């Protein structure tokens, strides 16, 4: 009986470790997704770029998105 309980606990621990590894591997934010709350979690070779948003001269937010490195966006007039 003790062997069955011990085996169950060991299997539970192994499954928990595997799930934790999978979750830690999925934490990066992909290209063009919002990164306002976690600016340092964009995937490899991607930066979190933020810009100030104004409506009628009043700042209404600071949205951030994961964008490609060394890419510059310009405003189209």
Curated annotation (Swiss-Prot):
It holds the Pfam family Toxin_35. GO terms for cellular component: extracellular region. Coiled coil: none annotated. Keywords: Disulfide bond, Secreted, Signal, Toxin. InterPro entries: Spider_toxin_CSTX_knottin, Spidertoxin. Expressed by the venom gland. The keyword Secreted applies. Its main location: secreted. It is found in: Secreted. GO terms for molecular function: ion channel inhibitor activity; toxin activity. Residues 21-26 form a propeptide. Contains 4 disulfide bonds. Residues 1-20 form the signal peptide. Belongs to the neurotoxin 19 (CSTX) family. 09 (U10-Lctx) subfamily. This is U10-lycotoxin-Ls1c. It comes from Lycosa singoriensis.
